[in-house]
From Swiss-Prot:
GO molecular function, one term: oxidoreductase activity, acting on the CH-NH group of donors
Location of the region described as tRNA (mnm(5)s(2)U34)-methyltransferase in the Swiss-Prot/TrEMBL record: 1-247
Protein name, entry field: tRNA 5-methylaminomethyl-2-thiouridine biosynthesis bifunctional protein MnmC
Gene3D superfamilies assigned: D-Amino Acid Oxidase, subunit A, domain 2, FAD/NAD(P)-binding domain, Vaccinia Virus protein VP39
Superkingdom of the organism of origin: Bacteria
Organism, scientific name: Bordetella parapertussis (strain 12822 / ATCC BAA-587 / NCTC 13253)
Subcellular location: Cytoplasm
Length: 632
């Protein structure tokens, strides 16, 4: 894989998603009032999918004998093309080991509506798959959503939003295109030449395309995009459809797998490293993790009883908000099936606002974003208190997807995956030797080597790169600093059993774990050590009291300095966004660091960003976001 840094795409003004509305025409066909067209052929929707899109792309024959195959679709609709493709893949004993579908949809159905239309329109043989699709259907939030089926062997990456805005921001190596969507007369943007060219840049050398549409301007646009096109007999009442083949000599994407199947070495066994190792192991890669903490007989996050994962929102839906939203969804989908106590508890988060002015501004933000109310909604003080099960100081917003996570248990579970081995060692220096990167200890002895090395060692990453002569091209990374902080454990009985959900604002207070509620946290600049102590505990007690409106009477018996707690470091980069991706000046070296206070938000997402690029999969993030987090 070419370890390039993605250019930042120009940002378009935010436009909220407009969900699809279930409407049927007089013949009982699902109908789009927005575009004045039906969703499928009047004869047989699944038959159209098989005739036009599968046979039109030479499937299943073309995918046989391949390790992976990627399909790109415009217009997901109710998902019949995907379900038909899925069934064909299941039925073929010579299928590729991994099948990826990337599909764009400007007007997605809500989960309940999707299930209803599939119950009404999908054939009986696809109903079981339709149920699985609906069960994983994401909330109607703009951006990319990665779903996994068949134990991860089949992935569906949904792009919710305008196709002409999403298409230039996709990363993939596409083998077949399903060009669907409503007719050009009603939805010309779906067939815009610039949009088709943006999709065509993803085409593999032998890529094919198929579309039910045979309009002359569409065929001409596809020819200009680098395809040899022809008409073929259509399906049902249509005389013709369009087929295409990538022309030889046209530029192809450089997102081919990097050392496909080769072992990977991860430096760092904290949350970042564990998540990268887990993501790679799920894809069948052998991973070795270097754990410096084990040299001292320690475990990462030992004593860190619980932490919170809460998304953020912004009026302009800026990169931090988009990354946070994607990260929280990825964390839940990746970790929810882990064994207890590693699996997150999706208890929700009440995020309190400081004052009435900020609450009014937040209400305006939600009105602009128009996110689903079952994902985020305004709550007044009484509603917030009812959700928390305790009186709180103010109202704010409620994030239904807020989670409580036990970091130590999570890291242990991620590193226990099949294909992951751990070595107790400290990386002192990196050295290139042929096609391998060697990791040396302080005595210059080789600890491990691999063609691909991921540095996930937090604030030690700049030191390691500097000592290896590799830091100079990375000025942002060179400015990373370590910020100490501590959390305090409060007895749950002092809080009437503790809150039912995460309570956040100026600090945070978490639901009880093993009889203790975590209150946090402090920020200590310039500290020589990360320590718990009386001053930090006093700060955390005051923050907890501020969230509740007043200190509970039982707080009077809690003596700062005598309470249990945990202290650690945050690796902070300028802009407080993480750095994840390849190092352009050192092929084979990758970075996953700088997670600051949002390690839980970034870890699963950054792990999948790196693993997807290493394994030649469609990317789970848009290129403008990849540019924001690219190591530099």
């Amino acid at each position: 894989m070419n370890s390039r840094i993605f250019p930042a795409a120009m940002s378009a003004p935010y436009a909220p998603l407009q969900p699809a509305v279930v409407v049927h025409d007089e013949q009982g066909r699902l109908y789009s009032a927005a575009y004045g067209d039906v969703y499928h052929s009047r004869d047989d929707a699944a038959g159209q999918a098989e005739h036009v899109f599968l046979r039109g792309n030479g499937l299943p024959q073309r995918w046989r004998g391949r390790a992976r195959f990627t399909v790109c679709e415009t217009g997901f609709g109710m998902g019949l093309n995907f379900l038909t493709l899925w069934q064909a893949w299941r039925d073929d004993p010579a299928r590729p080991r991994r099948l990826h579908m990337l599909s764009l949809e400007g007007h997605p159905f809500a989960r309940e509506d999707l299930l209803a239309v599939l119950r009404a329109h999908a054939p009986a043989g696809l109903q079981a798959l339709a149920t699985q699709l609906a069960a994983q259907w994401p909330p109607l939030l703009p951006g990319l959503h990665r779903l996994e089926f068949e134990g991860g062997a089949l992935t569906l990456t949904l792009g919710f939003g305008a196709a002409q805005q999403l298409a230039p921001r996709l990363t993939a190596r596409v083998d077949a295109y399903f060009l669907d969507g409503c007719a050009p007369r009603g939805n010309p943007a779906m067939w815009d030449p610039h949009m088709l060219q943006a999709l065509a840049r993803l085409a593999a050398p032998d890529a094919t395309l198929a579309s039910w549409c045979s309009a002359g301007q569409v065929r001409q646009a596809l020819q200009q995009a680098g395809f040899a096109v022809r008409r073929a007999p259509g399906f049902g009442g249509k005389w013709h459809m369009t087929l295409g083949q990538r022309l030889p000599g046209v530029a192809t994407p450089d997102d081919a797998p990097d050392d496909d199947g080769a072992p990977v070495l991860v430096v760092g066994a904290g949350l970042a490293g564990a998540a990268v190792a887990h993501a790679l192991a799920l894809r069948g890669r052998a991973v070795t993790v270097l754990d410096a903490a084990r040299l001292a007989g320690l475990a990462s996050h030992a004593g860190h009883a619980a932490a919170a994962l809460t998304p953020v929102i912004a009026r302009d839906d800026n990169p931090r908000a988009r990354l946070s939203r994607a990260g929280s969804q990825r964390a839940w989908l990746r970790w929810r099936d882990l064994p207890a106590p590693a699996a997150p508890r999706r208890c929700g988060t009440v995020q309190l606002e400081r004052d009435a002015g900020r609450a009014a501004a937040l209400a305006q933000t939600l009105q602009i974003l128009q996110f689903p109310a079952d994902w985020v909604r305004m709550v007044d003080r009484d509603q917030a208190g009812a959700l928390a099960g305790l009186p709180v100081a103010r109202g704010g917003v409620f994030f239904a997807d807020g989670m409580l996570v036990r970091p130590g248990a999570l890291i242990d579970a991620l590193l226990a995956g099949e294909g992951i081995s751990t070595i107790a060692a400290q990386a002192a220096r990196l050295r290139r030797h042929g096609a391998q990167w060697q990791v040396l200890d302080a005595q210059g002895r080789q600890v491990a080597q691999a063609p691909v090395v991921v540095l996930a060692n937090a604030a030690d990453a700049p030191r390691l790169l500097a000592d290896s002569g590799l830091l100079e091209p990375l000025p942002r990374l060179a400015r990373m600093h370590a910020l100490a902080g501590e959390v305090t454990l409060l007895p749950a009985e002092a809080l009437s059993g503790g809150p039912r959900c995460v309570v956040g604002g100026e600090g945070y207070l978490l639901p009880a774990v093993d009889g203790w509620c975590v209150a946090g946290s402090t920020y200590v600049h310039g500290a020589a050590q990360a320590l718990t102590g009386a001053e930090g505990q006093r700060v955390n007690l005051d923050k907890a009291a501020g969230l509740l409106g007043q200190a509970p009477a039982a707080f009077a018996s809690l003596q700062p300095g005598s309470l249990p707690g945990w202290a650690g470091w945050r690796a902070v980069l300028p802009g407080r966004l993480p750095a994840a991706g390849p190092l352009a000046h050192a092929p084979g070296l990758w970075l996953a660091a700088g997670y600051a206070s949002r390690g839980l938000s970034w870890a699963a997402l950054m792990g999948d960003v790196i693993a997807a690029r290493l394994c030649g999969e469609p990317g789970p993030l848009e290129t403008d976001l990849l540019a924001q987090i690219a190591p530099r």
